[in-house]
Amino acid sequence: MSYETITTTRTGNVLKLTLNRPERLNACPPQMADEIFDAVRDLDGARAVLMTGEGRAFCSGADLAANADKSGTGPINGGDRAFTSLQRHYNPMIQALASVPVPVVSAVQGPAAGVGCSIALAADFVIAGKSGYFLQAFVNIGLVPDGGSSWMLPRLVGTAQATRMMMLGEKIHGEEAERIGLIYKCVEDEALTAEAEALAEKLANGPTLALGLMKRNIRAGLESDFTATLLMEAQGQREAGMSQDSMEGAMSFLQKRKPAFKGA
């Protein structure tokens, strides 16, 4: 499918989704949110997703120019417009990214700011170059974090660091982001693309049905009690144990060879 604000390409089992408004540092208007939603809802058999940004930024946030009030009525109606835009465009996109049934990798260079931070962190694995940084810029314009930040950040880095990011609006550069557990890994800028592509390919060639169940269990486990989590794991093990990949894994172990998983 052809898009205007993103590009999608398929390499083997990996769907690469690139935010493609480099002249705006890949700022995300509602149209981009809708196109991301559409792209990840129809994977067409892809077994992993790699998200990148074209040019020198991952995503500089929502496109304030596209969302600006041109009516002259001022900020009062702005809150209503923001609510409607979030509910119609940005929240469905973030929910879709978080619900992708296969592994998602994001590769961050330059800013991942505002909703761009949420887009990046919605991935299962976030790799940043040393130039990459994560910014909750909302406080600088008198707004509150959105895009699921209030849910994601405390769970990733704890309430102290989440409060710092949201209330102080400080940039968290790649190396610090790795150190505090915000992201998976920070690498040299020139290694970012290769590292992210290699990880996405490795995941895509793995037992992606089981990986999808792991994703489900991790998310659900954040909200479930211990007993419910044990049951959920047992149910997942039953489902995974009936898969072709499980049979292939057992046979490859017995035959002392590398498994050839199919994601089924």
Q: What are these language model-derived features?
A:
Residues 1-54, 95, 251:
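Conserved CoA-thioester-binding segment of acyl-CoA-metabolizing enzymes
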Residues 6, 95-211, 242-243, 247-251, ...:
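Crotonase-fold acyl-CoA enzyme core
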Residues 17, 21, 35-36, 51, ...:
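Terminal peptide-recognition signature
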Residues 32-36, 86-89, 192, 233:
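Hydrophobic alpha-helical membrane-association signature
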Residues 45, 53-96, 112, 142, ...:
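Glycine- (often His-adjacent) and acidic-residue-rich active-site loop
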